[in-house]
Amino acid sequence: MNLNFMPLLHAYNHASIDFHFNSSARDFCVHEVPLYEFSNTGEHAVIQVRKSGLSTLEMLHIFSQILGVKIAELGYAGLKDKNALTTQFISLPKKYAPLLEKNTSNFQERNLKVLSLNYHHNKIKLGHLKGNRFFMRFKKMTPLNAQKTKQVLEQIAQFGMPNYFGSQRFGKFNDNHKEGLKILQNKTKFAHQKLNAFLISSYQSYLFNSLLSKRLEISKIISDFSVKENLEFFKQKNLSVNSNALKALKNQAHPFKILEGDVMCHYPYGKFFDALKLEKESERFLKKEAVPTGLLDGKKALYAKNLSLEIEKEFQHNLLSSHAKTLGSRRFFWVFAENVTSQYIKEKAQFELGFYLPKGSYASALLKEIKHEKGENNDEF
C-alpha cells in the first residue's frame, strides 16, 4: 500500500469555500465534557484547568514541577490541542489540593489557571470523557461564503460527517504512520514503549482513514451512477453484488451506504452488532440511533463480513493482527455534530461556529468538510 497521504474524500459535493482559519487561543477553543459527575468526596482531587499554548503533556509536567506530584499520579481523559484555548479535567492525589491556591501565580505565569476543585473516588483515566465542545472563528469570510458555509452546516446537522482522524495523529511531517509500520516490521524501535504504541496507533489511524475514504467513494458511485454502471464497477473491482442489492443500496436515504456485512454500533455508545437488515439499519442510521463502523486492525479485532469484508481486507495488515501489544477495535465511520450554532459578523468578515462532538472525533474533520480545500492532503491542525 502507498503510505503517502492522498486526498481524503468529502461527504458533500459543494465547491471549496475560501476563508482563513488560524488555530490559536483566540480563534479555537476546546472544552472537555466529563463522562460522569464528580462525587465531591474521595481520595482524588479533580481540577478543571484552562491552558493556552501548551500541550496536555507539557501541562502535566508543569503540575509535576510546581506541586511535586509524580506524573504517573496525575489522571487525564484525553490530549487537548496545544494551539488553542482549552479546558479539561485533571485528577491528582487529595494531599496536593492545598498547594493549588498557593501556586495560583506560578500557574498563571505558565498560561495555566485552575477553574474549579472537586473530589472523586477514582483517578481520571484515558477515555473518561463524554466529548468536547468546540468554538472556531473563521476570518476573511465573504457574505456569499458565509451563506455557503451555513448550507453545509445544515447538511452536516441532518446527515452527519465522516469521522476521520485529524492530523494530530500523524505528526508535523505526516510520517508517524510510516514509523509505526517500521516498528511492526522490526526495522526501528524507540526506548519509550508509549511512543512505540502511539506510532503504531498512527498506522492504524492511517488505514482507517483510507478505508473510510474508499467507502465514501463507493457510496458516491452507488448514488451517482445507474445500476448497470454500478454492476460493471463492482465487477472490475472483483466485488460480488447483484442488481437487486444495488437497487436497495441506491434507495438508502443516507449518503453513506450501509453494506452487507457491516458492523454497526449503537450511537453515541453501545454494543457492536452485524447489519442483517440493511433497510432497517439505514433508517436507524438516518435517525442517528446506530452507525456503521470501520476497522482499527490489531489483535482480537472484530472484522466485517461479506461485501464489507471484501472491501475491508485491503486495509488489514497481518503485522497488526499478530502484534501482541496492539489490540484491534472498531471506530465510528460517521459522527453527528450536536448543538451547532453559527454567527456571521459582516463588518468583521468573520464567521463564528460552535458545536459538540463525541470523544475521539476531531474538529478538523468538520473543518475539512466545510472548507473542501483543493489539493489538501491533511488537516490544518
UniProtKB/Swiss-Prot annotation:
One of its GO terms (molecular function) is RNA binding. Belongs to the pseudouridine synthase TruD family. Its EC number is 5.4.99.27. The active site is at 81 (nucleophile). This is tRNA pseudouridine synthase D. SUPFAM superfamilies: Pseudouridine synthase. InterPro entries: PsdUridine_synth_cat_dom_sf (IPR020103), PsdUridine_synth_TruD (IPR001656), PsdUridine_synth_TruD_CS (IPR020119), PsdUridine_synth_TruD_insert (IPR011760), TruD_catalytic (IPR042214), TruD_insert_sf (IPR043165), TruD_pseudoU_synthase (IPR050170). Responsible for synthesis of pseudouridine from uracil-13 in transfer RNAs. It is an enzyme of class 5 (isomerase). Pfam families: TruD (PF01142). PANTHER family: TRNA PSEUDOURIDINE SYNTHASE D (PTHR47811:SF1). Residues 160-335 form the TRUD domain. It catalyses: uridine(13) in tRNA = pseudouridine(13) in tRNA. Keywords: Isomerase, tRNA processing. GO terms for biological process: tRNA pseudouridine synthesis. The keyword Isomerase applies. One of its GO terms (cellular component) is cytosol.
